[in-house]
A protein has these predicted regions:
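Bacterial Sec-dependent N-terminal signal peptides
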Residues: 1-54
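Short secondary-structure capping/junction motifs at helix and strand boundaries
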Residues: 35, 170-175, 582-592, 603-614
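Short, intrinsically disordered, charge-balanced linker/junction segments flanking boundaries
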Residues: 49-52, 691-699
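Terminal accessory carbohydrate-recognition/targeting modules of carbohydrate-active enzymes
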Residues: 52-485
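Active-site-adjacent bridging/hinge elements
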Residues: 411-414, 502-512, 542-550, 626-638, ...
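Substrate-binding groove/exosite segments of carbohydrate-active enzymes
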Residues: 417-420, 473-596, 603, 647, ...
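The feature captures the catalytic groove of carbohydrate-active enzymes
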Residues: 422, 426, 430-457, 558-566, ...
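Extended, well-ordered alpha-helical scaffold segments
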Residues: 452-470, 485-493, 540-553, 586-603, ...
Length: 699
């Protein structure tokens, strides 16, 4: 029997067919009764292999996107206040937020800010993120609280359950403030062209290639996955330009693919740019036209045009080659007729955060229409003692609290720098040891769709509440008896993990949803997100896969991977864990070449990587981030000593382990040449650590 257990365990751990010959020999050498048992065991193991080998990751996730595409348009994406968000258009960098803010009537008001402690907690979020609960603690511990649960019903609707609980021996008078508002990417373009314009616009950052003469260490690893020379500015029509020394050196060149439409075979190309006052940036233009482009500087954005002619409509190239006179900020270029280009109008774009508000007859709902958003949004609630208000201030945590005693005004006017549409439900009187659940509906769509959903909510609320279902894959069912005592803590950890996701984050020319180590870090973070992926593996395999994929790039990309922070190979650790947990050959194959590209760059095999130290062969990453080992409590070593000769041991050690992981994957995928390369790297780095990792001076 010991041999049987050994065989089963070996098979389960390896999932490799090489165990089968050993099992077959054991069957042949056994008596009939044992053979029957072993044959049954063999059938079970085949079933286990088949089940474990199936991909649990949807085919739609095997893309080049850096977004967590398996998420819904609704989710906890806000960078301001805890609640539910809706993304009307992933490309726009715009987000609609809705937050419930409980409090005591004319007394303490909770403002659940996501950036600091504010008496709310991510309480229970299921793995699919279709049910999101926050607890608002008004009197410690569990004496007076409100649990707000967002049930995502479909792409148009989220039902909100607000359970107010009084566990004290006296009456409690509570309030619920429902806040709706629009939010944007932090720096929005201040200018636009008319929507009915008869011209084509091309962003300068949408190039097919951008080749500077001087290749910096960041040539194949642009920070945050941005494009080369990409720079954010509100003066741009898109929010981003080619700047940061673009065109500074003679021979710098950028290429574009343009599409000439029928009837536009002859026209003008108008370049929008900003060159410093008194300077001129010049380029040779090739491709669709041969010309010399002079971008004379005024210190402001201007448009200069050159003619083009082509025989027929279709795709053409446009190449700009710098003459090295001076750098410029290139916003992009227009294509149109000579008359159209001459009449280009650049209009001011006012950031619109004040909606048109239409309240219902019962004053228990309102519909919002924001100028910059095509969607309508509707809010409805089933509590009669309520008032619809507007709050005009950008800091609710101070201004709104000051207005706690103003329970009469319909407009609370502060600095007018932001707008919140507010449903004020008050008072909610709770008898001793009682609770009350109030429901609200947040919906989106066309004006007609939103009106219909609101009417259904008021007329037949039970149809919505009946849609609330328990999770089909309840996590508690998967916990062993001895682990039940840890379930509360595990649930809170899962909720914290899944609530730390934000939108929008900009990378690779797109806005994405992104899991963060905390919403204070409103950015990418490479090694932190590797650890987040490790945690997600035990929560949701698909999200874990997408979290790893988000930091990889297709082979041959401008950036070897998405880099922010200390460049450690934690994505490779998550890759190994994902493989062990899923046995997904598809995931193994898809991620392997991307992670190999990551690994090759960090071990100095990319010709533009500067990680390999001359002489020792150890790895150092000072050119890519100040803190090579990721320590937050030590000063950066390169600032204290010569960065050319000092490097932390941990960097090389990390990539030895990464090499061992990728070697296993290469063996599984049959890449014999890669296996030899990894073995060589392991040997080189291991040998280098022995003589060069001891510092006599520091001991």
């Amino acid at each position: 029997m010991d041999n049987l257990y050994f065989l089963l365990n070996s098979f389960y751990l390896s999932k490799k067919s090489k165990v089968l010959p050993l099992l077959q020999r054991t069957i042949l050498n056994s008596n009939m009764k044992t053979k029957q048992s072993l044959m049954m065991l063999l059938m079970i193991m085949f079933w286990i292999t088949s089940a474990l080998g199936q991909s649990t990751i949807p085919p739609s996730c095997f893309t080049d996107s850096h977004d967590i595409t398996s998420l819904q348009a609704w989710g906890p994406y806000s960078k301001r206040y805890a609640g539910i968000s809706h993304i009307p258009d992933m490309k726009a960098g715009m987000r609609f937020d809705f937050s419930v803010m409980p409090g005591y009537y004319r007394n303490r008001q909770l403002i659940p800010h996501v950036l600091f402690e504010s008496s709310y907690y991510p309480w229970d979020i299921n793995s699919s993120m279709s049910r999101i609960t926050y607890r608002y603690e008004m009197e410690w511990k569990d004496r007076v609280f409100t649990d707000v649960t967002y049930y995502i019903l479909d792409e148009h609707r989220t039902l909100v359950g607000m359970n107010c609980v009084n566990n004290t021996a006296v009456n409690q008078n509570l309030v619920l403030n429902l806040m709706a508002y629009i939010d944007y990417e932090e720096e929005q373009p201040q200018f636009k062209i008319p929507e009915d314009s008869n011209i084509q616009w091309h962003n300068a950052t949408d190039y097919t290639s951008n080749e500077p003469v001087r290749k910096s260490p960041q040539y194949n690893l642009v920070y945050d996955g941005w494009n080369r020379n990409e720079m954010r500015t509100s003066q741009s029509l898109s929010g981003f330009v080619l700047g940061k020394g673009f065109g500074r050196d003679k021979g710098d060149k950028v290429n574009y693919e343009i599409n000439i439409l029928p009837g536009k075979e002859k026209g003008m190309i108008g370049f929008r740019y900003n060159t410093p006052k008194g300077k001129t940036s010049t380029f040779q233009v090739k491709g669709i036209t041969e010309s010399r482009l002079e971008l004379q500087g005024t210190g402001e954005y201007n448009i200069v045009s050159i003619p083009y002619t082509c025989k027929e409509p279709g795709k053409y190239t446009l190449e700009l080659i710098s003459e090295g006179t001076h750098s410029t900020d290139l916003d992009g270029f227009f294509i149109g007729s000579e008359e159209d280009i001459k009449q280009i109008k650049i209009l001011p774009r006012k950031l619109s955060f004040i909606p048109e508000i239409k309240s219902g007859k019962t004053k228990q709902d309102f519909i919002l229409k924001y100028p910059e958003c095509d969607n309508y949004y509707g809010i409805a609630w089933n509590y009669q003692e309520s008032q619809i208000r507007e709050v005009l201030d950008n800091n609710l945590e101070s201004f709104f609290r000051k207005k706690t005693h103003d329970h009469v005004s319909s407009r609370l006017i502060g600095n007018r720098e932001w707008h919140y549409s507010n449903a004020f439900l008050r008072p909610i009187v709770l008898a001793p040891h009682s609770e009350q659940t109030i429901y609200a509906l947040v919906c989106t769509g066309t004006s007609q769709q939103v009106n219909e959903q609101i009417q259904k909510f008021h007329s037949t609320p039970e149809t919505l509440t009946s849609l609330i279902q328990k999770d089909s894959n309840n996590s508690e069912d998967r916990i062993l008896a001895d682990g039940k005592k840890y379930e509360f803590g595990r649930r809170l950890l899962q909720s914290a993990l899944l609530s730390n996701i934000v939108y929008p984050v900009h990378t690779q020319g797109q806005y994405i949803r992104h899991f963060t180590p905390g919403k204070n870090w409103n950015s990418l973070y490479t090694w932190d997100s590797g650890f987040i992926a490790l945690g997600l593996i035990d929560v949701d395999i698909t999200k874990a896969f997408e979290c790893i994929r988000a930091y990889t790039t297709p082979v041959g990309s401008e950036s070897a991977f998405i880099h922010h922070g200390t460049p450690l190979p934690i994505q490779m650790y998550a890759y190994y864990d994902l493989w062990n947990n899923t046995q997904s050959k598809e995931a193994l194959q898809f991620l392997y070449p991307r992670l190999k590209q990551f690994f090759d760059f960090m071990t100095g095999k990319n010709p533009y990587s500067t990680t390999r130290m001359k002489g020792s062969g150890l790895l150092r990453t000072w050119d890519y981030f100040y803190n090579s080992g990721g320590w937050d409590d030590y000063p950066p070593q390169h600032a204290l000593r010569d960065k050319a000769s000092v490097t932390p041991v941990v960097t090389s050690a990390y990539y030895i382990r990464a090499a061992k992981i990728l070697r296993l994957a290469a063996k599984e995928l049959g890449f014999k040449k890669d296996v030899k390369e990894y073995e060589q790297t392991i040997k080189q780095l291991s040998n280098a650590l022995q003589p060069y990792s001891w510092d006599k001076e520091t001991g």
